[in-house]
């Protein structure tokens, strides 16, 4: 048995012993740097060499503390089984040992209990933009708020030398958002009786594509579009101002579920969201609705609708970044622009992944980024941009990195996509991209073809890719195979990858009670991740595109090969990865020709995913390396 107070107390004491006197670790990490590093205070360059761990508070630190029956996410015997910030603090030293320097969390905002897709709400169904999800408070702690506990988490991370990034969702909200009572005009509304029939219109004369100026007429002339527009109505405060005033007085500040009463009184409700891609087969986003960023349709779309048409949602309105619109809903914009700064001021967070930022109107996107940087010039933004060809655009818009599509390209080793992505596409990017074979939305690496072999391959490969930000999806390091969500590159069958007798069989963390297999970790995977920490920490700061050298490898269309030379010290690093999972391959490296490098020895850091200390023999200035099928390795030269 573990005494939780001794356990947590011991970890917290160890962290606090590392704190420097007089330093306020609740401020942004960039403000904590020594004065001699003043140039880095305004620099966001740290992002491109970050080693990032992504987690979902509710699931990553969830555990069956009662020790019997099944995990239910309950609060029993004084314990909170679902994840909490307190348990997150206990996880930080574990991440530090893995070499992690940046932690990224899925949304921590208060989520809605309505329109759930499973046992639990999605973290993206944001009920309050400024409140933290109350269930993330640990029942072991008395006299502290959930805000206190998150602040402590950020401080602990900063003490350990880690930055904290959050996910921000400025485009959608829960369909029973707390903002509805104060600002019903910030939402779209449909008649309640039409809710069952509401769905994205199918446009017969178009394929799977995005809305554009060229296809607007086709979109609006479609019969299903006309049907959809007929479902919309005015906001309830306009339908009956007096009844709304009374309803508002009865509901505001009481913390009760007001949506049912609103539907009964006015016969309206916010509609579910759907994709901005035309003819997208994915179902409606039943737990969220779009915020009304504009009071009118896009300028070019107005000719296609009746002047008396109620505000509505359609592809061109969702993809607001593609269409000019002179009717900004200014009070809503001002509110959204100040959400991130509120977290900066209260908690000292260090960056944001901007959900659906690519669909925001350019002026709003720019204002959000600018306001955050006014408070902290070192504050970073990651664009949820899956097309790496949009890297230049993301850079121009002020982002520091893009999500990218490594999760799609890397698993397709047999199709040559992994080689294409890592060898040809990444080095030329204008912005770094996250590199990982899995994300919270995709299948796990262990569930891909070649399973554990591929998971090991992808881990070593992604440690030192040019323009690649190494990203670990929580659970990867202990061999998790169950996906957290089915949103990308997956099917409904993807939820059934565990044995049927496993308590998590068929469960999805985004929507169900969920816990990792902490009691049965894959020690082989964990030891591999742990073994890379010293090398990653030592070399990450100089293994980037500024120090990338080309032309020293024998040609290969199967082996990914990159070489970095330290700009000052007598040191180089080589990453090699055989994308052929059926045959071994040789590659030779002309190390003697590397400029300004005195070769004392060439060390192979890994051999078939075992840490080694083997030095390679040179042959007329070359080294020759054989890579087993699906093997990745690292060479260091000193």
Label the model's feature ranges:
Residues 11, 15, 453-604:
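Loop/helix patches that line or flank the sugar-binding groove of alpha-linked glycan CAZymes
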Residues 55, 95, 105, 129, ...:
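Conserved, mostly hydrophobic/aromatic
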Residues 1-31, 202-240, 244-277, 282, ...:
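Active-site-proximal helices and loops of the catalytic beta/alpha 8
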Residues 615-638:
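C-terminal beta-strand-rich structural cap/linker in extracellular carbohydrate-active enzymes
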Residues 51-53, 103-105, 164-166, 352, ...:
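Hydrophobic faces of well-ordered beta-strands that scaffold small-molecule active sites
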Residues 85-99, 110, 124-129, 133, ...:
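Glycan-processing catalytic domains of CAZymes
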Residues 1-163, 171-173, 177-284, 630-634, ...:
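N-terminal structural segment of carbohydrate-active enzymes
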Residues 58-86, 125-147, 175, 316-332, ...:
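The substrate-binding groove and active-site-proximal loops of carbohydrate-active enzymes
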């Amino acid at each position: 048995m573990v005494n939780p107070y001794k356990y947590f107390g011991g970890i917290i004491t160890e962290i606090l012993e590392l704190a420097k006197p007089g330093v306020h670790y609740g401020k942004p990490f960039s403000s904590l740097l020594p004065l001699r590093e003043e140039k880095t205070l305004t620099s966001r360059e740290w992002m491109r060499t970050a080693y990032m761990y992504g987690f979902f508070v509710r699931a990553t630190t969830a555990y069956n503390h009662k020790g019997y029956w099944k995990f239910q996410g309950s609060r029993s015997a004084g314990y909170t089984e679902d994840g909490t910030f307190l348990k997150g603090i206990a996880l930080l030293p574990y991440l530090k040992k893995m070499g992690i320097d940046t932690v990224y969390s899925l949304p921590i905002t208060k989520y809605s209990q309505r329109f759930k897709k499973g046992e639990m709400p999605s973290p993206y169904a944001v009920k309050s933009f400024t409140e933290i999800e109350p269930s993330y408070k640990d029942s072991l702690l008395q006299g502290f708020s959930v805000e206190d506990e998150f602040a402590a988490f950020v401080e602990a991370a900063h003490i350990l030398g880690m930055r904290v990034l959050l996910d921000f969702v400025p485009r959608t909200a829960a369909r029973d958002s707390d903002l509805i009572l104060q600002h019903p005009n910030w939402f779209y509304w449909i008649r309640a009786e039409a809710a069952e029939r509401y769905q994205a219109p199918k446009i017969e004369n178009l394929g799977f594509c995005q809305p554009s100026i060229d296809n607007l007429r086709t979109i609006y002339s479609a019969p299903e579009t006309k049907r959809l527009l007929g479902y919309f109505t005015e906001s309830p405060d306009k339908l009956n101002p007096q009844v709304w005033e009374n309803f508002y007085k009865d509901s505001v500040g009481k913390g009760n579920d007001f949506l049912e009463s609103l539907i009964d009184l006015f016969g309206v409700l916010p509609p579910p969201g759907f994709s901005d891609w035309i003819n997208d087969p994915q179902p409606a986003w039943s737990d969220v609705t779009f915020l009304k960023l504009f009071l009118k349709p896009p300028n070019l779309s107005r000719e296609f609708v009746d002047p008396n048409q109620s505000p509505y949602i359609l592809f061109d309105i969702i993809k607001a970044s593609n269409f000019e619109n002179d009717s900004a809903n200014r009070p809503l914009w001002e509110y959204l622009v100040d959400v991130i700064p509120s977290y900066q001021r209260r908690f000292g967070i260090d960056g944001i992944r901007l959900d659906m930022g690519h669909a925001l109107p350019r002026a709003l996107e720019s204002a959000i980024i600018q306001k955050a940087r006014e408070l902290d010039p070192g504050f970073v933004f990651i664009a949820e941009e899956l097309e790496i060809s949009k890297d230049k655009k993301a850079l121009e818009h002020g982002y520091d990195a893009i999500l990218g599509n490594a999760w799609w390209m890397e698993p397709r080793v047999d199709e040559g996509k992994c080689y294409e992505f890592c060898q040809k596409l990444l080095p030329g990017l204008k912005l770094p991209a996250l590199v990982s074979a899995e994300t919270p939305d995709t299948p796990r690496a262990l569930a891909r073809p070649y399973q554990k072999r591929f998971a090991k391959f992808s881990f070593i490969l992604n440690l030192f890719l040019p323009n690649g930000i190494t990203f670990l999806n929580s659970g990867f390091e202990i061999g998790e195979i169950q996906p957290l969500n089915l949103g990308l590159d997956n099917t409904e069958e993807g939820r059934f990858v565990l044995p049927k007798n496993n308590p998590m069989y068929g469960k999805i963390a985004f929507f169900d009670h969920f816990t990792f297999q902490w009691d049965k970790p894959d020690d082989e995977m964990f030891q591999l991740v742990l073994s890379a920490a010293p090398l990653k920490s030592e070399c990450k700061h100089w293994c980037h595109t500024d120090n990338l050298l080309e032309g020293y490898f024998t040609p290969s269309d199967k082996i990914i090969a990159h070489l970095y030379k330290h700009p000052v010290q007598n040191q180089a690093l080589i990453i090699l990865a055989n994308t052929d999972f059926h045959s071994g391959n040789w590659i030779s490296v002309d190390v003697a020709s590397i400029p300004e490098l005195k070769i004392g020895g060439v060390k192979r850091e890994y051999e078939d995913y075992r840490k080694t200390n083997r030095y390679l023999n040179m042959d007329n200035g070359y080294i020759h390396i054989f890579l087993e099928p699906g093997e990745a390795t690292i060479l260091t030269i000193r």
